[in-house]
Amino acid sequence: MLNDAKQTRANPGTSRPHSNGGGSSHGNELPRRTEQRAQGPRQPARLPKQGKTNGKSDGNITAGETQRGGIPRGKGPRGGKTNTRRTPPKAGAQPQPSNNRK
């Protein structure tokens, strides 16, 4: 009986910090993953449109090739977006020395 009570107390105690810690880490990763997923479908959506303009009959064959080429291209812009995010903090650091001069 006493052993059962101790186990029940230990279980919720361990589950609470574990769930909170895991949830916080996953919460940070999820938004990053969603951003990458959003970028993927946007680019292929533009490529099929180009393939249709080239030729509807042969568009099916060319569309597959254009989509494959578009996927590696999508990886390049992702790096550029990360650079843009890094730039704003740099701009914020510039006014700080000016305040010190004052």
UniProtKB/Swiss-Prot annotation:
Transmembrane segments: none annotated. Residues 75-88 have a biased composition (Basic residues). Residues 1-102 are annotated as: Disordered. It comes from the Viruses. Residues 8-17, 51-65 have a biased composition (Polar residues). Not known. Encoded on a subgenomic RNA (RNA3) synthesized during replication and which is co-terminal with RNA1. This is Protein B1.
